[in-house]
Amino acid sequence: MRRLITILPLLLFVGLGVAFLRGFDRDPREIPSALIDKPVPEFDLPPLPGHKQGVASADLKGDVQLVNVFASWCIPCRAEHPIVSRLAEHDRVPVRAINYKDKPEDALAWLAKNGDPYTAIGADRDGRTAIDWGVYGVPETFLIDRQGRIRYKVPGPLSPAIVEGEILPLIAKLRSE
């Protein structure tokens, strides 16, 4: 019994160490989404003032496209914006946007300063649509297939590595289906 009491703390320490090290094998950006391979949630967002088109679930069928959730107050959104712009400019994929919990005048000023690569922008003033999409924070980007199903989600800012290594190959695959 005495021997067990001396060995027990050591076993507990080793067990905690193994559990801790296993955590390093996981990608902290991988946040599971229950919406992967499911149809986009039903929604219909009005456009930002001065824009012709908002974004609705019906718009997300027929072509492979991205939906980017952004806000003018979001610092990582500014960092990823050139990447989103390059994706849209080179006709690689249409990009629609959900402007999350933002003042319209701030969003418009941000787009005027940084450029507007979006096919359409829906104003989600109260954040309700983002909740339905399972958004944890901004930015987040979703890849939508031709049938209007969410096929991939990037929580956090896009990076060239994510675009080249994951998004573009998946776009090519979805377009060939």
List where the protein language model places each region.
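Hydrophobic beta-strand anchors of alpha/beta hydrolase catalytic cores
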Residues: 66-67, 95
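A generic structural signal for alpha->beta connector loops
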Residues: 37, 42, 92-93, 118-119
